[in-house]
Design a protein with these regions (language model features):
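N-terminal lobe of the biotin/lipoate ligase/transferase fold
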Residues: 1-141, 190
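Short, conserved beta-strand/beta-arch hydrophobic-aromatic motifs that form part
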Residues: 58-64, 141-165
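A hydrophobic, small-residue-rich beta->alpha segment in the mid-to-C-terminal subdomain
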Residues: 162, 166-198
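Conserved small/polar residues in nucleotide/adenosyl-binding loops
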Residues: 199-205
Length: 209
């Protein structure tokens, strides 16, 4: 039986969170390890591109991003380009899979954890068979992109809570020009960041995420 250790890290720059993931990944991927981790945090404004990212999905230059105070990182996760920033809950599960072929079920479980969380706030959401993430009738509300190495996952998901989504105007989110992006606050502006974070602190222990 493996133990899931859930850590709330507050606001953390992307580079620091990435280094922390790599350190935990080295530990979790050891055959005698019994501990998995779920890191919950918030990032400073940053745009990240995944292994499937195309250059034209970044709609401004990197110099313009710098002028706007937005960092840019090329990453080794799956997926295309996305934005992280204020009011967005980030979850990084560093978990050793029982079978490295179970990547797709792992991603589906992550999506279901988010759907369960949104349901607690009376927000209906759903997945798409040919895509990853979570959608609502108003648009996409959460993104998922992971990497598996040595049977162990890292990277993870982002869930939009506040409606400060200006950064998405600088990209084609996940490579989709027509993608509509929404947030929890577009359904109920009274839901706090802390309330959503607490929900994720408790839900994953009941699932194989």
């Amino acid at each position: 039986m493996r133990d899931l250790n859930i850590r709330w890290l507050g606001k953390l720059p992307y580079s620091e969170a990435y280094d922390l993931q790599l350190g935990l990944h080295r530990s979790v991927s050891q055959e005698d390890s019994k501990d998995d981790y779920l890191l919950l945090l918030e990032h400073n404004n940053v745009i990240t591109s995944g292994r499937s990212s195309k250059e034209n999905n970044l709609l401004v230059s990197k110099d313009q991003l710098h002028e706007l105070g937005i960092e840019y990182f090329e990453t080794d996760r799956g997926g295309d380009i996305t934005y992280h920033g204020d009011g967005q809950l980030i979850g990084y599960p560093i978990i050793r899979l029982s079978d490295p072929k179970k990547v797709i079920p792992f991603v589906r479980n992550l999506e279901n954890v988010i759907i369960d969380s949104l349901r607690k706030f009376k927000i209906d959401s759903f997945t798409k068979e040919d895509d990853t993430g979570v959608w609502t009738p108003k648009g996409k509300i959460a993104s998922v992109g992971i990497k598996v190495s040595k049977w162990t996952t890292y990277h993870g998901f982002s869930l939009n809570i506040f409606d400060s989504l200006d950064g998405y105007q600088l990209i084609n989110p996940c490579g989709n020009q027509s993608e509509q992006i929404t947030s929890i606050h577009e359904f109920n502006p009274n839901i706090s960041f802390e309330a959503v974070s607490y929900t994720h602190l408790t839900l994953p222990t009941n699932r194989e995420v």
